[in-house]
């Protein structure tokens, strides 16, 4: 049996219903509403409305007692949300209409004065900015904790050597801690990006009205201070209601953070695989196979890698929504919010899971050491001749000849004698034996940012100094 169509909604009871006589198609009601996802902004919407009520009183539009009644009424609405007692009713199109409807039920007609000079265009932008400031600060604390775990492990495990790769081919000897700090350096840049975008997020649109400004001379600087918007006020009312740069910037920063975490996860997925066996995820962050009893799959890492694609998709989605929209507010903008919510929620989960994986990860130094091979010292062999005055371009050729000699003989560089090497260049002498030392190879890279023990510990200390300076001990 076909389901009966819902009755059309009465537009005359809506906040915007004054010029309407017809009713809204029920499907359009559902299509248009945003309350199912924007109700999570109830606290920010109430906070913004309380600040606006105070500004109206300051401008002489509300009497003092009216402003107090509205502010206290909004506090009661907030208590209902906190207690899970707020009742959503038909016609509550979004969080703004829901809160205003309930306020008017509680305080009477004076509640209808709250929206004086205000549009949902400047209200919604304010709510999202206010919410996003808090979320970015939480993201920063989560990334900071991940960086702290990386720094602590790097210091504790600084003696561990492992193969370094380029093109996923054997390259040079590095410290495990150097590899880990390479990712922490990327996370630090991510944190800086989040920090740097905060002032642009924390810029106040409220007081811009629908597009042309507020005719009641509300003090926008006062509102910005009330709401803690350190970026001041949006300088142009048309831009204020149309600007969604803060969404794109945040989703981009989140997307790049997820790219970095995806690359980190990919490395660990490779390092945990059978042929490598350098690391093993704890049981808390791995799963098994329904068929193969021996399997321990790095699902947490694979999901981190996969969710990076999801967040990148959100970035493309937001940009596609905004492209081609005419100046000032358009309903298209509503489509940005779910993408923003999903991005923020995903990043919170991804960073926390990454921190859990890293803090419980088991490393296998013996397997890492076993992965070191003689060919990874070929560059050191070239540098040996450099120190004897031979130009590097020549030494590179001579070292390559040694590698080829070993390959042709089916042996390693270690197996070549001094006499063998002398046939390549006469400056090879008995002291070349010192080259065949993986720890020495790492220690020779002692410049700032290098893989020597001193340099890696310096990187750790610099990261801790950064975290302390940013208040992320």
From Swiss-Prot:
Database matches in PROSITE patterns: FUMARATE_LYASES
Annotated site residues (Increases basicity of active site His) in this chain: 302
Catalytic residue list: 167, 289
BP term (GO), one: arginine biosynthetic process via ornithine
EC number: 4.3.2.1
Gene3D superfamilies, A to Z: Fumarase/aspartase (C-terminal domain), Fumarase/aspartase (Central domain), Fumarase/aspartase (N-terminal domain)
Domain of life: Eukaryota
Pathway(s) where this gene product acts: Amino-acid biosynthesis; L-arginine biosynthesis; L-arginine from L-ornithine and carbamoyl phosphate: step 3/3
One of the record's GO molecular function terms: argininosuccinate lyase activity
CDD domains per UniProt: Argininosuccinate_lyase
Cystine crosslinks: none
Enzyme class: lyase
Keyword flag Lyase: yes
Residues holding 2-(N(omega)-L-arginino)succinate: 34, 121, 166, 297, 329, 334
Leftover remarks: Often used in tagging mutagenesis schemes to generate new mutants.
PANTHER family: ARGININOSUCCINATE LYASE
Name of protein: Argininosuccinate lyase
Protein source organism: Chlamydomonas reinhardtii
